[in-house]
Design a protein with these regions (language model features):
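Single conserved hydrophobic/aromatic residue that forms the stacking wall/gate
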Residues: 1-5, 10
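Active-site glycine-centered loops adjacent to acidic/histidine catalytic or metal-binding residues
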Residues: 27
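Switch/coupling subdomain of P-loop NTPase systems
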Residues: 80-109, 119
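Conserved catalytic-core segments of large NTP-driven translation/proteostasis enzymes
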Residues: 60-65, 116, 123-224
Length: 224
């Protein structure tokens, strides 16, 4: 909900140089936030990529009422009804943009602001182009609140729908091409961290799955 940080700049510039798709989730909309147009402009100027808002916030902070899904043309309403275990409980309900139920959710000002901003986005904003997304030239942008888990599920669903399938990997030792669709589990170990707890001789391997399915509790053999 603030401006782009230096760590994000470095990471995303590497993604841009390597043409890796970049998906953006603008968090903490249930707190006071900057203007969403300003946030997208900030991303475009600093990271050098275009943006396409997949949904659009309705208000922010105490006035945050939800998001408008530009694909389904529906409003996903945000309503907090207290806390459970320190985390806000949130009810999510869908409503059409012209649904009379929105009159109960939105003030006349917020309703008109939403209509005006959606018209502006539909008429003047960048068009969605999946090829540009896959080349790392266009970033789909989502708004929500991770703490309350609001807007996270649509983000993940679109991420799975839009991102490409895993690429085949060539084994550096054998030269074998590992098909990501084969059933046998295999993974590339890119980092081993040791002695994180001085009371134990621990070693944790960080890996990228190349084929098969990882299941919690399974045993895997490290070839090295």
């Amino acid at each position: 909900y603030g401006l782009v940080g230096s760590e994000m700049c470095i990471r995303d510039r590497v993604c841009t140089l390597r043409h890796i798709p970049i998906f953006t989730f603008i968090n903490k909309m249930d707190r006071e936030a900057r203007d969403p147009f300003e946030l997208m402009e900030n991303i475009e100027e600093i990271l050098g990529i275009k943006t396409y808002p997949m949904n659009w916030p309705i208000g922010c902070g105490k006035e945050f009422k939800g998001v408008f899904d530009r694909n389904t043309r529906k409003v996903l309403a945000f309503s907090s009804d207290g806390r459970a275990n320190g985390v806000k409980k949130v009810d999510e309900t869908e409503a059409e943009l012209g649904d009379p139920a929105l009159d109960e959710l939105l003030t006349p000002y917020l309703h008109q602001q939403l209509v005006d901003e959606i018209e502006l986005l539909d008429g003047a904003a960048e068009e969605f182009d999946l090829d540009k997304v896959l080349r790392g030239e266009l970033s789909p942008v989502f708004f929500g609140s991770a703490l309350t888990n609001f807007g996270v599920e649509p983000f993940l669903e679109n991420f799975l729908r839009l991102t490409p399938t895993p690429l085949a990997r060539v084994d550096s030792l054998t030269g074998e091409t590992v098909d990501p669709c084969r059933d046998e589990f295999s993974a590339f170990i890119f980092k081993i961290q040791a002695n994180m707890n001085k009371a134990h001789r621990d070693r944790i391997a960080f890996m990228r799955i190349c084929s098969g399915k990882f299941e919690r509790g399974m045993e895997a053999f490290h070839v090295q």
